[in-house]
Amino acid sequence: MGGQVSIDENVHVVIVGGGFGGIAAAQHLKHHGVPFMLIDILDAFHHNVAALRASVKAGFAKQTFIPYKETFGLNFLQGRVTQIDSETQTVVLDNGKQVRYSHLILCTGTSGHFPGKHNSVDTYQSAIQKYEDFVKEIQEANTVVVVGGGTTGVEMAAEIRTEFTDKKVILIHPREEVADPDLLPSVKEQAKQVLLEKGVELLLGRKVTNLDELELNVCRKGMEIKTNKNEQVTADLVICCTGNKINSDAYRSTLTTCMAESGALKVNQHLQVEGFDNVYAVGDCANLNEPKLAYHAGLHAAVAATNIINSLTGKCLTSYRTGNVTMLIAMGKDAGVGQFNGYKLPQFLVTKGKSQSLLVWKSWREMGQKAPN
């Protein structure tokens, strides 16, 4: 294959995490003929940019899971990495299996509440069924409360009202502004207006005080949701879109001194973890001052993989520089807001560029597979 480089037989890159950053790094190394092993808890890549649509649209979830084996063959291993031994340069899986590395790319991502995240060791067929079952819970509910009005909560509320215009959807959020805090004020206001136009009821400046007592993601008629404003909201279904945290379990015991307070890994401009020239952090687990986005993870992966190749071929390392915020928020298939490089985008561009397809086609193309009908 064109672009392959001459590699020492001792070189073996291990990629921990098969999200957007992980598959981008794997494809880059594969193209250049660099031996690697991609490890993930699921047996398929989850295009979780489309997870919320898979939560409301029956039959859609199968388009959001792309099997790793068909793309990477024996270069993929399913399992959970529980430990990294930097002395022996091995990663240890939960089944006791050890995999040696010469270079390590950590793409562990974040975990959070279903349906926005799917974080359990699973088969993709089982994961697809979980989303199909969740669609039925939404279908059964008359009133849905979405807790958390960040980007995920905004998208969730909009997807429900787009697919089910007869359902009452209430979004509860502690801030007066919705969506990501890093967005331009005008974009956040636009997101708020789209929600209102879609008929979402907004309870802003409020926190849910009894979340721990509520059964999430299951339709239960007459659930009472309490806020810190002494309000009670009655709903049939509660969906939590808050509390994502960095997946640091794989490296916490070994790389504690390299971790920021959030659990992310401190990196230099080459995305090398502090104190290591052969360990890289990519995506959400890299402590960079920018939003945690699939788009950024892909950029990180290209830098990390390129730097591994450059280090093997005696070339200078490339640097990663954060830029102005680029973020597109899909608010159902017919609406979207966002900005590019710090500039607000027209809604029709976001709708056409992201909301209609959620870029599912792009992941299938990058994985070299054909999407199911």
Regions found by a protein language model. Give the residues of each.
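C-terminal, flexible cofactor-proximal segment of oxidoreductases
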Residues: 10, 291, 300-373
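FAD-site-proximal beta/loop scaffold in flavoenzymes
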Residues: 123-142, 232-302, 306
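Glycine-rich active-site loop/strand segments that organize a redox cofactor
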Residues: 41-47, 51-56, 107-137, 338-339, ...
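Beta1-alpha1 glycine-rich phosphate/pyrophosphate-binding loop at the start
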Residues: 2-77, 113, 155-185, 348
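A Rossmann-like FAD-binding core segment of flavoenzymes
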Residues: 76-84, 90, 99, 165-269, ...
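Glycine-rich Rossmann-fold phosphate-binding loop(s) that bind the pyrophosphate
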Residues: 17-20, 148-150, 290
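FAD-binding core/adjacent interface of flavoenzyme oxidoreductases
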Residues: 2-11, 73-145, 239-241
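Eukaryotic N-terminal low-complexity, Ser/Thr- and Lys/Arg-rich leader segments
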Residues: 1-12, 218-224, 364-373
